[in-house]
């Protein structure tokens, strides 16, 4: 889910 990516953005 996109929300999951926003929760912990991997640099």
Swiss-Prot record:
The protein's matches in InterPro entries, at most eight in alphabetical order, are given as: Periviscerokinin
Q: What is its main location?
A: secreted
UniProt keywords, alphabetically: Amidation, Neuropeptide, Secreted
Q: Which residues carry this modification: Valine amide?
A: 11
Name the job this protein performs. Answer: Mediates visceral muscle contractile activity (myotropic activity).
Name of protein: CAPA-Periviscerokinin-1
User: Where in the cell is the protein located?
Assistant: Secreted
What does the record list as GO biological process? Answer: neuropeptide signaling pathway
